[in-house]
Design a protein with these regions (language model features):
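Bacterial N-terminal signal peptides that target proteins for export
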Residues: 1-9
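Extracytosolic ligand-binding ectodomains
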Residues: 2, 23-434
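Hydrophobic helical h-region of N-terminal Sec-dependent signal peptides
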Residues: 11-14
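C-terminal motif of bacterial Sec signal peptides marking the signal peptidase cleavage site
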Residues: 19-21
Length: 434
C-alpha cells in the first residue's frame, strides 16, 4: 500500500478505519511495531494491578490499537503517538510524581476477538485508561467491558455517532469528531460540486451506517436527491448487484464509504463505466485512505475525491518529525496527533483529579479541554495544574473544547483529490465544521 499519501493524510485525516509496542515503566518507552504477540508490556516491578486500575500508585495506560485487521495501516502512527505522549509526560515529571506506564495491545477487527482478549489482559494488569480502538465497530464490542470495570476508554479515531449517546457511565471519550460533522462536510462538498443526485454504497456497521446516514440527511436538506442507498455486509467481496443498481441509477455522484474493500468496489465501478475517470463524480471518506495502494491499477482513481477529519500537519512540524523518527517516514501518520492528545488529556485529568481511578479521571477530562488557562503541552499544563489553575489544553489537534458527551465540539476536515496515474491525493482545502 502506498504510504506517501497516508503520510500527508496522517494527521490530516481528519474518517475512518498493535504491533505490540513494548516499553518499560519509567521514561523508557519503546514502540517496536514489529511484534505480533499482542504487545504485552509491564512495569519493571511486575505489578499486576487490580482489574479496573485505580490503585493510586501510578497511572497505567493500556492501548488497543490496530496492528492487525482492516485498519492495521493506522497502527504505527497511533502506537507511536501514544509512546511519544508518555515520553513527554515522564520527561515533565510524570503523574503523581511517578512515571506513567503504557501497556500496548492490538485491537484486530470485528472478524476476531482480539480486542476482547486484549482488554481482559489490560484490565488484569491494572490499566486505569485504555486508548482505542481505532475502529468504531471494534470499540462497540468492548466498550461495556471496559467502562463496566470503572476504566476510561478513550479513542483517537472513533467517528460513529453512536458514541455520543451511548450509555458508557461517563467513561468514554474521543478526540476524533463525530461523523455527524463529516457527513455535513461531505454533503456540502458534493452539492457545491454541482451534483443534484447522488447514490451511496456503504459498509453495514457503526462507522459506515452512521456516516452514510449523516450524508443522506445533510444532502437531502441541501436540496439533493438520493437515488440509491446501498448497504453491504462487511465480509462482502463481490459487488455485482450493488454496481448494477448504481449503473441503473445514473446519479451525478457516487459516495463510497468503506475500508480496504473499497478497492473492489471502485474496480467494478470502473469496469462498468461509472468510476472516477468517467463522467460520474466519485467521492470517498477517511476509511478509504490508502486506496491507491490496494489497487492493481491505481490510475483508475484519477479524479476520486475524499473527505477526512484532519489535523493540519503544517502547524505541527516538530511533532511530525518526531513521529516519523519513531515509526519511519514511509508509515502513515493518520491519527498520530489525536492519539498523542488522548494520552495527554488523560494524564492531565488524572493530575487534576489527584487520582488514577477511572471515575475520578473521567470527571475532569472534559474540563481540561475547555474554560481555563490555555496551554499547549503537558509540561506547560502540569505547571499550571500544580499552581492550582484551571487549564484548557489546546493540543496538536487544536482546541478540542469537549462537549459534555466527551467529544470535540468542532473539527477541521481535509478535502483531497487523486491525480494522474493514481498518484497520492493532493490537498484541495481544509474545511472547519462545528
Amino acid at each position: 500500500m502506498s504510504k506517501k499519501m497516508l503520510k500527508l493524510l496522517g494527521m490530516l485525516m481528519a474518517i475512518v478505519m498493535v504491533a505490540a509496542a513494548c516499553g518499560s515503566s519509567g521514561s523508557d518507552v519503546a514502540s517496536d511495531g514489529g511484534d505480533d504477540d499482542g504487545g504485552e508490556e509491564t512495569s519493571d516491578d511486575g505489578d499486576d494491578g487490580a482489574a479496573g486500575g485505580g490503585d493510586g500508585d501510578e497511572l497505567v495506560i493500556g492501548t488497543i490499537l490496530p496492528v492487525t485487521g482492516d485498519l492495521a495501516f493506522l497502527g504505527p502512527a497511533e502506537i507511536g503517538g501514544s509512546n511519544l505522549a508518555v515520553e513527554d509526560i515522564n520527561a515533565a515529571g510524570g503523574v503523581f510524581g511517578t512515571d506513567v506506564v503504557i501497556l500496548q495491545g492490538d485491537s484486530g477487527d470485528t472478524t476476531t476477538d482480539t480486542a476482547s482478549v486484549e482488554v481482559d489482559r489490560l484490565l488484569a494488569e491494572g490499566s486505569d485508561a485504555i486508548i482505542g480502538a481505532a475502529s468504531s465497530a471494534v470499540s462497540l464490542t468492548v466498550i461495556e467491558r471496559i467502562t463496566s470495570a470503572g476504566v476510561i476508554q478513550f479513542s483517537p479515531a472513533n467517528t460513529s455517532p453512536d458514541f455520543t449517546t451511548f450509555d458508557d457511565n461517563g467513561l468514554y471519550f474521543r478526540t476524533a469528531p463525530s461523523d455527524l460533522l463529516q457527513g455535513r462536510v461531505l454533503a456540502n462538498q458534493v452539492i457545491d460540486e454541482g451534483n443534484a443526485t447522488a447514490s451511496v454504497i456503504f459498509r453495514q456497521e457503526s462507522y459506515g451506517t452512521g456516516l452514510a446516514d449523516a450524508f443522506q440527511e445533510n444532502f437531502e436538506a441541501a436540496g439533493g436527491t438520493i437515488d440509491e442507498f446501498l448497504a453491504y455486509a462487511v465480509d462482502t467481496d463481490t459487488f455485482d448487484a450493488e454496481i448494477d443498481a448504481l449503473v441503473e441509477a445514473g446519479s451525478d455522484a457516487i459516495v463510497v464509504i468503506g475500508f480496504a474493500e473499497s478497492a473492489n468496489i471502485v474496480t467494478a465501478m470502473n469496469e462498468r463505466g461509472i468510476g472516477p475517470t468517467s463522467d460520474t463524480n466519485v467521492w470517498g471518506v477517511d476509511g478509504n485512505a490508502g486506496l491507491n495502494g490496494e489497487l492493481e491499477d491505481p490510475s483508475i482513481l484519477e479524479g476520486f475525491r475524499q473527505t477526512a477529519p484532519s489535523v493540519d500537519t503544517g502547524d505541527i512540524p516538530e511533532f511530525i518529525d518526531r513521529l516519523q523518527a519513531e515509526i519511519g517516514e514511509d508509515e502513515a501518520i493518520i491519527f498520530g496527533a489525536e492519539t498523542y492528545d488522548a494520552v495527554i488529556i488523560t494524564a492531565l485529568a488524572a493530575a487534576v483529579a489527584g487520582s488514577d481511578g477511572g471515575e475520578a479521571i473521567a470527571a475532569e477530562v472534559n474540563d481540561v479541554t475547555r474554560g481555563g488557562t490555555v496551554c499547549t503541552s503537558f509540561a506547560e499544563c502540569i505547571e499550571l495544574v500544580n499552581a492550582g489553575e484551571d487549564i484548557d489544553y489546546d493540543g496538536l489537534g487544536g482546541p478540542y473544547e469537549f462537549v459534555d458527551a466527551g467529544e470535540p465540539a468542532a473539527a477541521s476536515f481535509q478535502i483531497s483529490t487523486y491525480g494522474v496515474d493514481g498518484a497520492d491525493p493532493e490537498l484541495d482545502v481544509f474545511v472547519f465544521a462545528s
